Swiss-Prot record:
Its main location: cytoplasm. Binds to DNA and alters its conformation. May be involved in regulation of gene expression, nucleoid organization and DNA protection. This is Nucleoid-associated protein MADE_1013280. The keyword Ribosomal protein does not apply.
Length: 109
Protein backbone atom coordinates (compact mmCIF):
# COMPACT_ATOMS: atom_id res chain seq x y z
CA UNK A 1 0.00 0.00 0.00
CA UNK A 2 2.76 2.46 0.92
CA UNK A 3 4.73 1.43 -2.14
CA UNK A 4 1.84 2.26 -4.50
CA UNK A 5 1.27 5.58 -2.76
CA UNK A 6 4.95 6.48 -3.04
CA UNK A 7 4.94 5.55 -6.74
CA UNK A 8 1.95 7.82 -7.29
CA UNK A 9 3.68 10.68 -5.49
CA UNK A 10 6.80 10.20 -7.61
CA UNK A 11 4.70 10.18 -10.80
CA UNK A 12 2.95 13.40 -9.76
CA UNK A 13 6.30 15.00 -8.95
CA UNK A 14 7.63 14.04 -12.39
CA UNK A 15 4.54 15.50 -14.07
CA UNK A 16 4.89 18.73 -12.09
CA UNK A 17 8.56 18.94 -13.05
CA UNK A 18 7.66 18.54 -16.73
CA UNK A 19 5.00 21.25 -16.48
CA UNK A 20 7.46 23.55 -14.71
CA UNK A 21 10.01 23.02 -17.49
CA UNK A 22 7.38 23.92 -20.09
CA UNK A 23 6.49 27.09 -18.20
CA UNK A 24 10.18 28.02 -17.93
CA UNK A 25 10.57 27.52 -21.68
CA UNK A 26 7.50 29.69 -22.30
CA UNK A 27 8.79 32.38 -19.93
CA UNK A 28 12.10 32.52 -21.81
CA UNK A 29 10.17 33.86 -24.81
CA UNK A 30 7.65 35.99 -22.94
CA UNK A 31 8.48 39.71 -22.93
CA UNK A 32 7.56 42.31 -20.34
CA UNK A 33 8.16 46.06 -20.49
CA UNK A 34 9.18 48.25 -17.60
CA UNK A 35 8.62 51.99 -17.79
CA UNK A 36 9.75 55.18 -16.09
CA UNK A 37 9.12 58.87 -16.60
CA UNK A 38 5.51 58.33 -17.67
CA UNK A 39 6.62 55.93 -20.39
CA UNK A 40 9.43 58.11 -21.73
CA UNK A 41 11.94 55.34 -20.93
CA UNK A 42 11.02 51.72 -21.61
CA UNK A 43 12.99 48.53 -21.06
CA UNK A 44 11.71 45.32 -22.63
CA UNK A 45 13.11 42.03 -21.38
CA UNK A 46 12.23 38.37 -21.42
CA UNK A 47 11.19 36.60 -18.25
CA UNK A 48 14.64 35.04 -18.03
CA UNK A 49 16.10 38.57 -17.75
CA UNK A 50 17.48 39.00 -21.28
CA UNK A 51 17.05 42.63 -22.31
CA UNK A 52 15.57 42.92 -25.80
CA UNK A 53 15.12 46.68 -26.14
CA UNK A 54 15.75 50.00 -24.42
CA UNK A 55 13.69 52.91 -25.74
CA UNK A 56 14.39 56.49 -24.68
CA UNK A 57 12.04 59.20 -25.88
CA UNK A 58 13.82 61.65 -28.17
CA UNK A 59 12.76 64.60 -26.01
CA UNK A 60 14.99 63.33 -23.18
CA UNK A 61 18.17 63.54 -25.25
CA UNK A 62 18.60 67.22 -24.39
CA UNK A 63 17.91 66.70 -20.67
CA UNK A 64 20.26 66.26 -17.77
CA UNK A 65 22.37 63.10 -18.14
CA UNK A 66 21.89 62.14 -14.47
CA UNK A 67 18.11 62.34 -14.80
CA UNK A 68 18.13 60.14 -17.92
CA UNK A 69 20.36 57.60 -16.16
CA UNK A 70 17.98 57.55 -13.19
CA UNK A 71 15.01 56.97 -15.50
CA UNK A 72 16.81 54.11 -17.27
CA UNK A 73 17.62 52.50 -13.91
CA UNK A 74 14.02 52.90 -12.77
CA UNK A 75 12.73 51.35 -16.01
CA UNK A 76 15.08 48.38 -15.57
CA UNK A 77 13.90 47.91 -11.99
CA UNK A 78 10.28 48.09 -13.11
CA UNK A 79 10.94 45.47 -15.80
CA UNK A 80 12.60 43.14 -13.27
CA UNK A 81 9.63 43.56 -10.91
CA UNK A 82 7.24 42.70 -13.74
CA UNK A 83 9.34 39.63 -14.63
CA UNK A 84 9.12 38.45 -11.03
CA UNK A 85 5.36 38.98 -10.89
CA UNK A 86 4.78 37.24 -14.23
CA UNK A 87 7.03 34.31 -13.31
CA UNK A 88 5.34 33.90 -9.94
CA UNK A 89 1.91 33.95 -11.56
CA UNK A 90 2.85 31.42 -14.26
CA UNK A 91 4.58 29.10 -11.78
CA UNK A 92 1.59 29.39 -9.45
CA UNK A 93 -0.52 27.91 -12.23
CA UNK A 94 1.78 24.86 -12.26
CA UNK A 95 2.12 24.42 -8.51
CA UNK A 96 -1.60 24.92 -7.99
CA UNK A 97 -0.93 27.79 -5.63
CA UNK A 98 1.06 25.48 -3.37
CA UNK A 99 2.76 27.78 -0.88
CA UNK A 100 6.53 27.79 -1.18
CA UNK A 101 8.86 28.70 1.68
CA UNK A 102 9.82 32.39 1.90
CA UNK A 103 12.83 33.13 -0.27
CA UNK A 104 12.44 29.88 -2.21
CA UNK A 105 13.51 30.34 -5.82
CA UNK A 106 12.43 28.04 -8.61
CA UNK A 107 15.35 26.66 -10.65
CA UNK A 108 16.19 28.96 -13.52
CA UNK A 109 14.72 32.10 -11.90
Amino acid sequence: MFKGGMGNIMKQAQQMQERMQKVQDDLANLEVTGEAGAGMVKVTMTCNHNVRRVNIDESLMDDDKDMVEDLVAAAFNDAVRRVQETSKEKMGDVTGGMPLPPGFKMPGF
